[in-house]
Design a protein with these regions (language model features):
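Arg/Lys-rich amphipathic alpha helix in sigma70-family domain 2
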Residues: 59-79, 96
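A short, charge-rich alpha-helical start-of-domain segment used by transcription regulators
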Residues: 1-18, 28-31, 42
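Residue-level preference for hydrophobic side chains embedded in well-ordered alpha helices
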Residues: 8, 12, 16, 37, ...
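Residues within helix-turn-helix
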Residues: 28, 129, 140
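DNA-recognition helix of helix-turn-helix
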Residues: 135-159
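A short pre-motif secondary-structure segment
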Residues: 117-121
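Structural recognition of an alpha-helix C-terminal capping motif at a helix-to-coil junction
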Residues: 32-39, 43, 51-63
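Acidic, proline/glycine-rich intrinsically disordered inter-domain spacer in sigma factors
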Residues: 81-108
Length: 162
């Protein structure tokens, strides 16, 4: 293993795993996705600009996770009526835990890249610049997509809590 590659693994492994974990919602699957991303890095290390390793790796990790979600969705049918039944009713008087559960479901229900952006920016509290770098989006895209994602969350809240 080259010294340069070993340094990249040490420097970016935790960040890649964090991105994978929040997209996939499964620690073991996130570990597998992270390993796959680093295998791709190993196979392409001579083709990648060393100054762009982090954004390249975060994008490969994200795309690999999205592929896994697509495969998972193809294999398991999602029961929307069950989710809707659990989340019905006003949130007024709901405990913080119930509100947290509702919010987690709402975030999970967002499509990519909205879900990743909300998790990285609002939950993990990364800066806009860090999120842009991780997902290889422009700063303007990050802000626009976050605005849309938050609007969707507000609309969902308004449906549950008039």
């Amino acid at each position: 293993m080259s010294k340069r590659y070993r340094q990249w693994v040490e420097e970016y492994q935790d960040q890649a795993w964090t991105v994978a974990r929040y997209i996939l919602k499964d620690a073991q699957e996130a570990e597998d996705a992270t390993q796959e991303a680093f295998v791709k890095l190993w196979n392409n290390q001579d083709k990648i600009d060393p100054e762009r390793i982090r954004p390249w790796l975060m994008k490969v990790t994200r795309n690999g996770c999205l592929d896994r979600l697509r495969r998972r969705r193809d294999n398991v049918e999602f029961d929307e009526s069950h989710m809707a039944g659990e989340a019905s009713g006003p949130l007024q008087g709901a405990s913080a835990n119930e509100t947290g559960v509702w919010l987690k479901r709402a975030i999970t229900g967002l499509k990519e890249p909205y879900r990743s952006l909300v998790v990285l920016r609002d939950v993990k509290q990364h800066s806009y610049e860090e999120v842009a770098g991780m997902l290889e989006l422009s700063l303007a895209q990050v802000k626009t997509y976050l605005h849309r994602a938050r609007k969707q969350l507000r609309e969902q809240l308004a449906e549950v809590r008039p």
